Amino acid sequence: YYLRNWHMRWFSENLTPHVFIRDLGEDYWGLSISGPRSKELIRNLTDSEIGKLPFMGCGNYDIGLIQTKIGRLSVVGELGYEINCRMGDHIALRRLLLENGKQFGIHEYGFNALLSMRLEKSFGIWSAEYTQGYTPGMTGLDRWINWQKNDFIGKKASYLEKSGNGPNQKLVTLEVDSSDSDASGFEPIWKNGKRVGFITSGGYGHRVEKSLAMGLINTDLAESGQEIDVHIVGKEKKAKIIPVSPYDPKGELMRA
């Protein structure tokens, strides 16, 4: 990620004596498995009690002879796991998963499919919904802030936003009335001829069969049911704000 160098520069400039830091990003490799039978697959490959790993839990597990760190996370809204291992083990791990997954009908899917499915869950991603240019209050990430924690970078500014009038824009999910093209990012959002926001990312949701987008819109308009206009490939399209997570709104599948 482009943020790695930015963070490493800050760490290097602010290290205290006798403290060392090393970026291990190139030493590890990750993949994810998703679907209602992913737990069965993982359980068959390890002797540990990974079946008891709770949603959002993480731990160290051996898959065969491969040491891994597994998190029970889901970007696509299904029961799933994210698995990380050393770079030298990734080919063996991939082969092991594909071979043992045949009995469950396993197959690989691409990055665009992942992006489509995460839109159906209203899951934002770095460099689109989340950047240094957007505040936690704008994107909803303020729910993860521990306000009782000692001073940290951005605490004062974030607290002033929280205790004041709030952010001037908020992240929302849109359903776009378009059958031939989808939003991709940075398209303007209009209301009564006035620009009131912009798209952060978009695509087609194949499970819900709708053109979807996420975007930042003026706070006074950021309510479900609000009708707006979006320019896609130079053409004005009707759109409306919808409740988050149009696919499996209660998140029952990924918590299965």
Language-model regions, residue ranges each:
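Conserved, structured C-terminal
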Residues: Y1-A256
